UniProtKB/Swiss-Prot annotation:
Keywords: Nucleus, Phosphoprotein. This is Ino eighty subunit 5. GO terms for cellular component: Ino80 complex; nucleus. InterPro entries: Ies5. It comes from Saccharomyces cerevisiae (strain ATCC 204508 / S288c) (Baker's yeast). The keyword S-adenosyl-L-methionine does not apply. Component of the chromatin-remodeling INO80 complex, at least composed of ARP4, ARP5, ARP8, RVB1, RVB2, TAF14, NHP10, IES1, IES3, IES4, IES6, ACT1, IES2, IES5 and INO80. The gene is IES5. Pfam families: IES5. The keyword Transport does not apply. It comes from the Eukaryota. Present with 2280 molecules/cell in log phase SD medium. It is found in: Nucleus. The modification Phosphothreonine is found at T124.
Length: 125
């Protein structure tokens, strides 16, 4: 029975790893395109919600400008959780507590900031 040449085994492993790397690079590109599409849609929805909020009550009427207005929370009760989270973060910032941001979240934030949006995504017609 012939023995396998160690160099051919190494070459085969290198080709396999290289092919996997190429596949992951393609997946990364696809995911970034999908993320851009999702971000554009979310930005459009936020713009519409802000215009509804401005028309109903005005964002300046909330105790903390960064909170979602009570009128909007009444329309969509699931948003109350987000107001609770915003309040929690605001309290920590007021008490000068450090907030640890995970590396994955920093990567997502960097990707968010580097994603180009169209003018219409952030402006109502």
């Amino acid at each position: 029975m012939p023995s396998k040449d160690p160099e051919s085994v190494i070459d085969k492993e290198i080709r396999k790893i290289s092919a996997r790397n190429d596949e992951l690079i393609k997946q990364d590109g696809t995911l970034k395109r999908e993320y851009t599409t999702l971000l554009r849609k979310v930005s459009s929805v936020i713009t519409v919600l802000n215009s509804i909020d401005d028309a109903d009550t005005g964002s300046a009427e909330t105790e903390l400008p960064r909170l979602i207005s009570q009128a909007t929370v009444e329309k969509v009760p699931e948003l109350k959780w987000y107001n609770d989270q915003i309040s929690l973060i605001t309290e920590k910032l007021e008490d000068d507590e450090d907030i640890e941001v995970p590396e994955e979240l920093m990567d997502a934030y960097t990707l968010y900031k580097e994603t180009p949006l169209l003018y219409n995504d952030t402006h109502t017609p």
